Amino acid sequence: MPRIKRGVTTRQKHKRLLDQAKGYRGRRKNTIRIARQAVEKAGQYAYRDRKVKKRSFRALWIQRINAAVRAEGLTYSQFMHGVKLAGIELDRKVMADLAMNEEAAFKSVIDQAKAALPA
């Protein structure tokens, strides 16, 4: 039975790894062991930050809605309570976009939410 040599597969693995480490600084771009660690850590950061991105966008939308609503004399929590009572089914992303780009439309949403709040 012939001996199996793994030089080709090792070279392919190393090449794929170094391609992933392209653009890194120092020995992280051309030393196999260090590049492997750097690529693995980059993957961990990417996985974590895909989750963080959702949180930070939601926080941004809330800040934008809050700023627009406070100009009309409500707090964010009062506004959201009024939105729920009024049965308005717009999510925060859409409301933040309305607050930024369509002030008249968002003003009507605020008026509906105010009307739904108990006096």
UniProtKB/Swiss-Prot annotation:
The keyword Transcription does not apply. Keywords: Ribonucleoprotein, Ribosomal protein, RNA-binding, rRNA-binding. The keyword rRNA-binding applies. Gene3D superfamilies: 6.10.160.10, Ribosomal protein L20. Pfam families: Ribosomal_L20. CDD domains: Ribosomal_L20 (cd07026). One of its GO terms (biological process) is translation. Belongs to the bacterial ribosomal protein bL20 family. This is Large ribosomal subunit protein bL20. It comes from Erythrobacter litoralis (strain HTCC2594). The lineage of its organism: Bacteria, Pseudomonadati, Pseudomonadota, Alphaproteobacteria, Sphingomonadales. The gene is rplT.
